[in-house]
Swiss-Prot record:
This is TLR4 interactor with leucine rich repeats. GO terms for cellular component: lipopolysaccharide receptor complex. LRR repeats lie at residues 61-81, 84-105, 108-129, 132-153, 156-177, 180-201, 204-223, 230-251, 254-275, 278-298, 302-323, 326-347. Residues 26-694 are extracellular. Component of the TLR4 signaling complex. Mediates the innate immune response to bacterial lipopolysaccharide (LPS) leading to cytokine secretion. Its main location: membrane. It is found in: Membrane. Residues 412-462, 483-563 are annotated as: Disordered. The keyword Ribonucleoprotein does not apply. Residues 488-506, 554-563 have a biased composition (Low complexity). Residues 359-416 form the LRRCT domain. Residues 421-436, 521-543 have a biased composition (Polar residues). The gene is Tril.
Length: 809
């Protein structure tokens, strides 16, 4: 057996030698090495680069993070054992210098972050070993000068950040070694001068940011940007530019975004943007422009967004945006504009976002064309809400143009800046019946139409159930019909406000086709006969005819205003779903409820819908009350629906039902809280009834009360038991208290000792027989018994003295 045990022992020893314990990796002090390829030493309070000699395999480290420490110097041996390193982060330290051989062994490094340190220069040759470097961050340092050797060897560099330094100039060919550079950040420096060849060899550059520098007041030399054939984004904002020379960007055929905001530009050459056919976004906000040359935007055929806010523009030529057919967003807010032509945006059919707020608008006849264009575009759903708030005249201060009545725009002696219609489409008003002797000038009777034709975009669809008379059908094209807005209804002018002297200067009936109310009947009455002699040969006759026409038009406008105030006219034209929910949709009621279905009905006020959008549809939203998230179920209903029945509902369950309008496939982003109704389905017949929550609540309350009573009873019984036990201990019989009284002599008490301990067994241990305690008086006879049996007289006397001292009064 001993031989077998020895054999087993040696086998165990050999097994332990064959499989030695794996050596644990030793991580540098204050660092984290949980991932074998990532050495994390960020925000550890380090003042020097930790030694990596303790790492078992430093060649496996691919990422080394040292950001957020207090490192001031990088030596030549800090990274010499990390030959496979791909990413090195040294940001937010206090590095002042780099040893020329710091990166000598990091030939595979792809990302180097040196931002937010105290570097004052990039010594030529320091970065040369980094042949595979693709990203270099040197932002937030104190670099004041660059040389061509600073980036020698960085042929693979794609992104370079030098922003937040103190660079004062860019020498020629400073970025020449960076042939593959795509992104260059030079913002927030002190660059005053751009060399003629500063960006040479950067033919692949796509992004260049030169904002927040101190560039010279005039940017005139186009040769600076000649090498940047692939540039798509150029940011020159927040400089001190005051003037742009002609064709300064002509060598940037792929430029898509140009930002010149926050400068001091007061003048732009008419050919400043020549050659920018691909430009999609132009930002000129925050300058001092007071006018735009007519041909300034002509080359920008692809322009989609233009920001001219925060300038000093007081007027714009009607043809300023005549070549911007793709323009979608335009901001003219916070300028000094008082009027705009109605045709200034006619060449931009894609325009849907227009900001005109913050100008000093004068609401008179010069804004009639703009109001008409806004109404047409908004009715077709092609334009978001435009806020044009009147500042002048004082009577209209604070009012919004889009809901002002045309009668309120007759003030002042002004001429509509919108171009007059062509001769073929011009329509003249006719004199009254009392002035039959006056005839229009020769040739005008043949141009007079029989009936005013409404514009195609104004012909709306009428909902069923709305009665429309013949006169209303002829007035479908009324441009001045009420249009609802989120700001509520606009002011109306009484009939007394329309006077013959306030008639408009223009005689074009297309401006207010609904005011004249010309029908075939009254046109036939006022049309001059062919036998009438024309009186238009002399200027006096022509002037008298025009005065009569103005009086006739004023009277018709007065009559139309009276009718509009009295409620006679067309229903409102609604294209916004939020306005539809607020003003048109009403009275959602629950008609019938069963165990598994419910019927709801709603009402729709009279209105018109634009032709491109079609009639209003409805969306019904319903869900069990209190469920999160709300409205998991909704149903789209067809046009002309005013009721719906919900099926497959759960019996005896509360539901919340809401309805909202759908116009042109769009719904209001605001929840339809104003058109909701609650219902509770009936219990299912013959089925098991649902839970009675009231009864369940009462039962639970009763059970809780019973539990509280039981707890109180248990506590009371325990307290009562304690009281009784204490009373029993304190109320012993008189003869017992008299027996153990300390006032009696000890001799009289010794007579009962033999009787009390007559059953004493001498073979039991002494400690078992008498468990002594100094706090118990019953120990006394037991002590005397033990002393009397083996102690003698002297022991008894000593104990008596002790007890006398202890129990003396």
């Amino acid at each position: 057996m001993e031989g077998v045990g020895a054999v087993r022992f040696w086998l165990v020893v050999c097994g332990c030698l064959a499989f030695p314990p794996r050596a644990e990796s030793v991580c540098p002090e204050r660092c984290d090495c949980q991932h074998p390829q990532h050495l994390l030493c960020t925000n550890r309070g380090l003042r020097a680069v930790p030694k990596t000699s303790s790492l078992p395999s430093p060649q496996d480290v691919l990422t080394y993070s040292l950001g957020g420490n207090f490192i001031t110097n990088i030596t030549a041996f800090d990274f010499h054992r990390l030959g496979q390193l791909r990413r090195l982060d040294l940001q937010y330290n206090q590095i002042r210098s780099l040893h020329p051989k710091t990166f000598e062994k990091l030939s595979r490094l792809e990302e180097l972050y040196l931002g937010n340190n105290l570097l004052q220069a990039l010594v030529p040759g320091t970065l040369a070993p980094l042949r595979k470097l693709r990203i270099l961050y040197a932002n937030g340092n104190e670099i004041g000068r660059l040389s061509r050797g600073s980036f020698e060897g960085l042929e693979s560099l794609v992104k370079l950040r030098l922003d937040g330094n103190v660079l004062g100039a860019l020498p020629d060919a400073v970025f020449a070694p960076l042939g593959n550079l795509l992104y260059l950040h030079l913002e927030s420096n002190r660059i005053r001068f751009l060399g003629k060849n500063a960006f040479s060899q950067l033919g692949k550059l796509r992004f260049l940011n030169l904002s927040a520098n101190e560039l010279q007041p005039s940017l005139r030399h186009a040769a600076t940007f000649v090498p940047l054939r692939s540039l798509s984004t150029l940011i020159l904002s927040a400089n001190s530019l005051q003037h742009l020379g002609p064709r300064v960007f002509q060598h940037l055929p792929r430029l898509g975004l140009l930002s010149l905001s926050g400068n001091q530009l007061t003048h732009l050459a008419p050919e400043a943007f020549w050659g920018l056919e691909a430009l999609r976004e132009l930002r000129l906000e925050g300058n001092r422009l007071n006018q735009l040359p007519l041909t300034l935007l002509e080359p920008l055929h692809s322009l989609e967004a233009l920001d001219l806010s925060g300038n000093e523009l007081s007027a714009l030529h009607p043809a300023t945006f005549g070549h911007q057919g793709r323009l979608r967003e335009l901001s003219l807010r916070d300028n000094a504009l008082s009027a705009l032509s109605g045709d200034i945006f006619a060449a931009s059919p894609a325009l849907y976002r227009l900001d005109l707020d913050g100008n000093g608008w004068t609401c008179d006849c010069r804004l009639r064309g703009l109001k008409r264009w806004m109404g047409n575009w908004h009715s077709q759903g092609r334009l978001l809400t435009v806020f044009v708030q009147c500042r002048h005249p004082p009577a209209l201060r604070g009012k919004y143009l889009d809901y002002l009545d045309d009668q309120l725009l007759q003030n002042g002696s002004c001429v509509d800046p919108s171009p007059s219609p062509t001769a073929g489409s011009r329509q003249w008003p006719l004199p009254t019946s009392s002035e039959e002797g006056m005839t229009p000038p020769a040739g005008l009777s043949q141009e007079l139409p029989l009936q005013p034709q409404p514009q195609p975009q104004q012909r709306g669809r009428l909902l069923p159930g709305v009665a429309w008379g013949g006169a209303a059908k002829e007035l479908v094209g009324n441009r001045s019909a009420l249009r609802l807005s989120r700001r509520g209804p606009g002011p109306h002018q009484g009939p007394s406000a329309a006077a013959p002297g306030s008639a408009p200067q223009s005689l074009d009936l297309h401006e207010k086709p609904g005011r004249g109310r010309h029908t075939r009947a009254n046109l036939s009455q006022t049309e001059p006969t062919p036998t009438s002699e024309p009186a238009s040969g002399t200027p006096s006759a022509r002037d008298s005819w025009q005065r009569a026409a103005k009086q006739r038009l004023a009277s018709e406008q007065q009559e139309s205003a009276v009718q509009s105030v009295s409620g006679v006219g067309l229903p409102p034209l609604v294209s916004d779903p939020c306005d539809f929910n607020k003003f048109i949709l009403c009275n959602l009621t629950v008609e019938a409820v069963s165990a598994n279905s419910a019927s709801v009905r709603w009402a729709v006020r009279e209105h018109r819908s634009p032709r491109p959008q079609g009639g209003a549809r409805f969306r019904l939203l319903f869900d069990r009350f209190g469920q999160q998230p709300k409205f998991q179920r909704f149903v789209y209903l067809p046009e002309r629906s005013d009721s719906a029945t919900l099926h497959e509902l759960r019996g005896d369950t509360p539901y919340l039902v809401c309805v909202e309008g759908v116009l042109g496939g769009r719904v209001c982003p605001v929840a339809p809280r104003d058109h909701c109704a609650g219902l509770v389905t009936l219990p299912e017949a013959g089925g098991r009834g649902g839970v009675d929550y009231q009864l369940l609540t009462l039962v639970l309350l009763a059970v809780n009360a019973l539990l509280v009573l039981l707890a109180l009873a248990a506590w009371g019984s325990r307290w009562l038991r304690r009281k009784l036990r204490a009373r029993r201990k304190g109320g012993a019989p008189v003869h017992v208290r008299h027996m153990y009284s300390t006032r009696r002599p000890l001799r009289s008490m010794g007579t009962g000792v033999s009787a009390d301990f007559s059953g004493f067994q001498s073979h039991r241990p002494r400690t078992t027989v008498c468990a002594l305690s100094e706090a118990d008086l019953i120990e006394f006879p037991c002590d005397r018994f033990m002393d009397s049996t083996g102690g003698g007289t002297s022991g008894s006397l000593r104990r008596e003295d002790h007890l006398l001292q202890r129990f003396a009064d």
